[in-house]
C-alpha cells in the first residue's frame, strides 16, 4: 500500500505544488505547475478535481489530502475565500459511499472549527456539514438541539432566511430518526416568521403540525396554535385536526378520521398511533376533572377492553405526565396529579390561587412559630425569676 501523502509541514506554495502533482498523477485534468494568479486560483483548480481521490483511495489517505486542502483554505482572507469554501463544501457532498462520507464530514467539521467564529462562512460550511452527516448517519454528532445550534452562531448570527433554510434541512434529516427533535426544529422555524410574512409559511406550518402530531413524545400541543403561520391555517383540515389533539377527546378524533380518512393518510400520519396518543390525551383531560375513575369509565371513554385498562394506565405512568395509583381490588384509578393539555387563563388563575393559598398557609405557620417562640421565652423568664 502506498504511503499517505502529507503536505502540512510544507510551505503554502509547496503544498499547492504537491497537491497539483498528486491529483494529476491520479488522472485529473490539472497542471502540475502552480498558477501565476496566486494561491486562490490554485485552490479553485485543486478543489475542482479533488473528487478523483474518492475513486481508489483509502479513507485515511483521502483524509490526509482533504486536511491539506483545508489547511490552505483557512489562510485565505475572508473577502476572497467565499467561493473557494462554497466549492469545497459542494464537493464534500459528493462522497460515493458511507465510509468516505464520514471522511468528508470530518473534513468539513475541521474547516468549520478552524474558521473564525465571527465568519459568515461558518453558516455555509455547517449547512453542507449537516447534509453530509445525513449521508453517514451522523446527524446527532453535529446537531443535538436548537440551543446548541444558536450558540455556535452567537458571534455571527445568520439571517432569518438562512436560518429558515437550515431549520428546514434539520427537520428533513431528523424526521425519520428523532421526531421529538424534528418537532422542536419546526416550531423554531415557525417562530422566525413575523405577522408580515407568516402567510407564506403555509407548507412549513403544515409540516410542523404533522411532525408534532406524529411524535409519540409530544403531548403539549397548545403552543402551536399561537404561532402566526399556524393561525393562517384556521379553517383548513390540518388546523381542525390539531385543535382536536389540543383540547378534544377520543370520539372527536374517531369522527374526524371517519370523515377525512384520505386526508389523514395523505399527511403520512398513522391512524393507530393517533388513536394511542388521543387515548393518552383523553386520559389526561379526564384526570384534570376526576381524582378517581372507574375501570368502566375508562373502557367507555378510551374505547378499550377491560383487560386493557391496567396495561394502558401503566404506560401512561411511564410518561410521567400523570401521577396515579391503580386500585385493582375496587377497579379504580386514583389520580394524584396531571399535566394540563392546555395552559391558558383558567390554569394561570388556578396556579395563582394555589400559590396564594400556600402563601397564606406559610404565613399562618410563621405566625404560629412566632407565638410558640414567644411563649417559650416568657416561660423561661418566669422560671428564672422563681429561682
Curated annotation (Swiss-Prot):
Pfam families given in the database record: eIF3m_C_helix (PF18005), PCI (PF01399)
InterPro entries from the UniProt entry: ARM-type_fold, COPS7/eIF3m, eIF3m, eIF3m_C_helix, PCI_dom, WH_DNA-bd_sf
Domain PCI: 181-340
Top-level taxonomic group: Eukaryota
Cellular component terms per the entry's GO annotation: eukaryotic 43S preinitiation complex; eukaryotic 48S preinitiation complex; eukaryotic translation initiation factor 3 complex, eIF3m; Golgi apparatus
Main location: cytoplasm
Keyword vocabulary terms for this entry: Cytoplasm, Golgi apparatus, Initiation factor, Protein biosynthesis
Database matches in PROSITE patterns: PCI (PS50250)
Biological process annotations from GO: formation of cytoplasmic translation initiation complex
Entry annotated with the keyword Cytoplasm: yes
Gene Ontology terms for molecular function: translation initiation factor activity
Subcellular location: Cytoplasm; Golgi apparatus
Alphabetical list of PANTHER family matching this protein: COP9 SIGNALOSOME COMPLEX SUBUNIT 7/DENDRITIC CELL PROTEIN GA17, EUKARYOTIC TRANSLATION INITIATION FACTOR 3 SUBUNIT M
Subunit structure: Component of the eukaryotic translation initiation factor 3 (eIF-3) complex. The eIF-3 complex interacts with pix.
Chain's role: Component of the eukaryotic translation initiation factor 3 (eIF-3) complex, which is involved in protein synthesis of a specialized repertoire of mRNAs and, together with other initiation factors, stimulates binding of mRNA and methionyl-tRNAi to the 40S ribosome. The eIF-3 complex specifically targets and initiates translation of a subset of mRNAs involved in cell proliferation.
Family: Belongs to the eIF-3 subunit M family.
Name listed for the protein in its UniProt record: Eukaryotic translation initiation factor 3 subunit M
Organism field: Drosophila virilis
Amino acid at each position: 500500500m502506498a504511503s499517505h501523502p502529507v503536505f502540512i509541514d510544507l510551505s503554502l506554495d509547496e503544498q499547492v505544488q504537491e497537491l497539483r502533482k498528486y491529483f494529476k498523477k491520479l488522472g485529473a485534468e490539472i497542471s502540475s505547475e502552480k498558477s501565476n494568479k496566486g494561491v486562490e486560483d490554485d485552490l479553485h483548480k485543486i478543489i475542482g478535481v479533488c473528487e478523483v481521490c474518492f475513486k481508489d483511495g483509502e479513507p485515511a489517505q483521502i483524509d490526509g489530502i482533504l486536511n491539506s486542502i483545508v489547511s490552505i483554505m483557512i489562510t485565505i482572507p475572508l473577502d476572497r475565500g467565499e467561493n473557494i469554501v462554497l466549492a469545497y463544501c459542494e464537493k464534500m457532498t459528493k462522497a460515493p459511499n458511507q465510509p468516505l462520507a464520514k471522511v468528508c464530514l470530518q473534513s468539513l467539521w475541521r474547516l468549520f472549527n478552524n474558521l473564525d467564529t465571527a465568519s459568515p462562512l461558518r453558516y455555509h460550511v455547517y449547512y453542507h456539514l449537516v447534509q453530509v452527516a445525513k449521508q453517514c448517519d451522523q446527524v446527532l454528532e453535529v446537531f443535538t438541539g436548537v440551543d446548541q445550534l444558536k450558540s455556535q452562531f452567537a458571534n455571527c448570527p445568520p439571517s432569518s432566511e438562512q436560518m429558515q433554510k437550515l431549520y428546514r434541512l434539520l427537520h428533513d434529516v431528523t424526521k425519520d430518526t428523532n421526531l421529538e427533535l424534528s418537532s422542536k426544529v419546526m416550531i423554531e422555524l415557525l417562530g422566525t416568521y413575523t405577522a408580515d410574512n407568516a402567510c407564506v409559511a403555509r407548507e412549513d406550518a403544515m409540516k410542523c403540525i404533522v411532525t408534532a402530531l406524529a411524535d409519540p413524545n409530544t403531548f403539549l400541543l397548545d403552543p402551536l396554535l399561537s404561532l402566526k403561520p399556524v393561525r393562517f391555517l384556521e379553517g383548513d383540515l390540518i388546523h381542525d385536526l390539531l385543535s382536536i389533539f389540543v383540547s378534544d377527546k377520543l370520539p372527536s378524533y374517531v369522527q374526524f378520521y371517519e370523515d377525512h380518512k384520505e386526508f389523514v393518510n395523505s399527511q403520512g400520519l398513522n391512524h393507530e398511533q393517533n388513536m394511542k396518543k388521543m387515548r393518552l390525551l383523553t386520559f389526561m383531560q379526564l384526570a384534570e376533572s376526576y381524582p378517581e375513575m372507574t375501570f368502566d369509565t375508562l373502557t367507555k371513554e378510551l374505547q378499550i377492553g377491560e383487560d386493557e385498562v391496567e396495561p394502558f394506565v401503566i404506560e401512561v405512568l411511564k410518561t410521567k405526565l400523570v401521577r396515579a395509583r391503580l386500585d385493582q381490588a375496587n377497579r379504580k384509578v386514583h389520580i394524584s396529579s396531571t399535566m394540563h393539555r392546555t395552559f391558558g387563563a383558567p390554569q394561570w388563575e388556578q396556579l395563582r390561587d394555589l400559590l396564594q393559598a400556600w402563601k397564606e398557609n406559610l404565613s399562618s405557620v410563621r405566625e404560629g412559630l412566632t407565638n410558640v417562640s414567644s411563649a417559650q421565652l416568657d416561660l423561661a423568664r418566669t422560671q428564672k425569676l422563681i429561682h
